[in-house]
Regions:
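Bacterial N-terminal signal peptides that target proteins for export
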Residues: 3-18
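Intrinsic disorder/low-complexity signature
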Residues: 9-10, 24, 33
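Bacterial N-terminal signal peptides
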Residues: 15-27
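Ser/Thr-rich, low-complexity intrinsically disordered terminal regions
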Residues: 27-159
Length: 159
């Protein structure tokens, strides 16, 4: 009987530990699902009201950023952009189509995830850009700086 009681206590303790671990894991701030991504009606999604997003299409003053201009072929600009993204720290391309790239960028310490998007319309020689944090209200300018660094890298490569 004592052995059965000890066994049940261990099972209850293990179950509680698993439930607490899952609860904490699900509620970690850096882990959340992305929403409002991709291209709709030839536009990237607008930014939320929080101060942790920039976008080059249809943005208000605090969220606006210039698109990246290029000369030459769209496919070459896209390939160069993909090469640049391979050297952006903690950034991984997770989706790409003929005219769209979606990458994830993680913060160094807390591993917060930012969604980084690029749209290359067929009728313009620009790359529209969007970078948004998944959580929080402010990113202290990280998304804007990241996109400006990507812009500078592409300019250095003379796209």
């Amino acid at each position: 009987m004592k052995n059965l009681r000890k066994c049940l206590e261990k099972i209850n303790h293990l179950t509680l530990t698993i439930l607490l671990t899952l609860t904490i894991f699900v509620n970690i701030p850096g882990i959340s699902w992305a929403t409002n991504l991709g291209i709709e009606n030839n536009h990237l999604a607008p930014c939320p009201t929080s101060n942790n997003c920039v976008v080059s299409q249809n943005a208000d003053a605090k969220h606006t950023i210039e698109p990246i201009k290029y000369h030459g072929e769209r496919e070459q600009a896209k390939e160069t952009l993909l090469k640049v993204l391979t050297v952006v720290p903690r950034t991984e391309v997770i989706e790409q189509t003929d005219n769209y790239i979606h990458a994830l960028s993680k913060s160094r310490i807390f591993k917060f995830i930012d969604d980084v998007e690029f749209y290359l319309p067929e009728d313009e020689s620009v790359i529209h850009i969007r970078s948004a944090s998944r959580v929080g209200e402010s990113d202290l300018g990280v998304n804007r700086r990241r996109m400006e660094q990507i812009r500078l890298a592409l300019q250095d490569l003379d796209i």
